[in-house]
Amino acid sequence: MSLVAIGINHKTATVDLREKVAFAPDKIHEAMKSLASRTKTGEAVIVSTCNRTELYCNTGDEADVISWLESYHQLSHDDVLPCLYKYQGQQVVQHLMRVSSGLDSLILGEPQILGQVKQSFVKAKEAGTVAVTMDRLFQNTFSVAKKVRTETEIGAAAVSVAFAAVSMAKHIFSALSATKVLLIGAGETIELVARHLKDNGVDSMIVANRTISRAEAMCEEFGATAITLEQIPDFLPKADIVISSTASPLPILGKGMVEKALKQRRHQPMLLVDIAVPRDIEAEVADLDDAFLYTVDDLQSIIEQNMASRREAAEKAELIVEEESHHFMEWIRSLESVDSIREYRSQSMAIRDELVERAINKLAQGGDSEQLILELANKLTNKLIHAPTQALTQASRRGDLNSLGQLRAALGLDKD
C-alpha cells in the first residue's frame, strides 16, 4: 500500500467547482466510510473547507480515488481532472504538513486550517476510517504544525486588516481585557475584529450599526451590546478603542463629536482605527491631543511589512516540513520491512521445527544422541545459509559489487 492524496483548492478551481466537490458536515461520516471501502486498508480522511477539498487514502490506486470523487458528486471526469492535484508517497506527507502549517493557505500562515484538519481527523476516527498509518500521519502532522508555529514567526505578524487593527490595539493597551470597545458597523470585517477582540479577552463591546437587527445578531454571538448610529455620542465617551468599518459615503465620527467625548473622558487617550473606504472618521480627529487615529492605509503598510516577514518565516517552515516528511517516510519504510522480517523468522522457525522433530523421532528409535545433535546442527546450518549463499554467489557472478556489499553487511561479514 502507498499513501495517495487528491484535491482541489482556491488555486486550482473556481468557487463554483469548489462548492460542487465540497462535503456537507452531516454527510461526511458516510462519505469517509464509502471512500474507505474502496481502499484495501480501509483508511481514508476527507478534509473539506470553503477553500479546499482533499482526500487522503492509504491505497495504491490513485485513479480509483478520483473515480470515487467524481461518482460521489456526480461530476464529469473532464470537469474535475484539470483542476485536481495528485500526490503519492512522501509528496502526500509533505503536502498535508504544508496545509496544516498554513503554508498552502490563501493567507500565508493563517492558523484556522490546522483546527479544520484536526476536526476532519476526529470525524474520520468517528467513522472508523483511521488505522495505524493514517493515525501516525495525522498525529505527526499536528506535531509538525506546532513545531512550525513555535520555531518560526509564520503566525506572529498580522496580515488581515481586522487582525492588524486588533494587533495595533494590543501594542497601545497593555491589557485589552480591561478596555471598552466601540465597533461601528456589523459587516464581515467588524465581525472578524470582534472575534479577534474576544479571543484577546475583551468582554466589554458595543456594536453600533445603521440596522439594529444586524448588530443584535452579531452581539448575540459575542456578548456585546447593540446600538444605533444615532446613539454613538452617548456611548463614545466610554470607549477606549473605536474601530469603524461601514459603507457610509460620509464620515460618521466628526472632530467635534470626538472632542466632546474626550472632554467627558477627562482627556484619557482614545484609539480610533478607521478601516472604512471612504473614511468613517474625519481626518481632523488626528489633530486632537488625546486621540490616536489610524486609517486603513496605516494598517496596509503594516500588513505589507508583516507579509514579507511571514514569507521569510515560511522559508524556514518549508525546511522543517521537508525534514519531518523524510522522518515519517523512514517510519513507513520500516513498516514495509516488518512483513519481510516476520516472514523470514517464520520460515526459519519452520525449518528448525521440522529438523528438531526428525531428530526427536530418531532419538526415540534409539539413535545415538551425540551423532543426532551434530546432524541437527549441520542440517540446520545448511538450511539457514542456503538462501544467503545463493544470493552471494549470484551477485558475484554478475559482478554486482553493490549488492555483494549489502549482502555482506546484512550477514555481518564486514565486522572488525
Curated annotation (Swiss-Prot):
Q: Entry's Gene3D superfamilies?
A: Glutamyl-tRNA reductase, N-terminal domain, NAD(P)-binding Rossmann-like Domain
Superkingdom, taxonomy of origin: Bacteria
> Which residues constitute the catalytic centre?
50 (nucleophile)
What EC number(s) has UniProt assigned to this enzyme?
1.2.1.70
Q: Which PROSITE patterns does this UniProt record tie to the protein?
A: GLUTR
Binding locations of NADP(+): 185-190
What's an example Gene Ontology biological process for this entry? protoporphyrinogen IX biosynthetic process from glutamate
Fill in the misc note. During catalysis, the active site Cys acts as a nucleophile attacking the alpha-carbonyl group of tRNA-bound glutamate with the formation of a thioester intermediate between enzyme and glutamate, and the concomitant release of tRNA(Glu). The thioester intermediate is finally reduced by direct hydride transfer from NADPH, to form the product GSA.
Q: What is the protein's known function?
A: Catalyzes the NADPH-dependent reduction of glutamyl-tRNA(Glu) to glutamate 1-semialdehyde (GSA).
**What does the entry's domain section say?**
Possesses an unusual extended V-shaped dimeric structure with each monomer consisting of three distinct domains arranged along a curved 'spinal' alpha-helix. The N-terminal catalytic domain specifically recognizes the glutamate moiety of the substrate. The second domain is the NADPH-binding domain, and the third C-terminal domain is responsible for dimerization.
Oligomeric state and interaction partners are given as:
Homodimer.
Record protein name field: Glutamyl-tRNA reductase
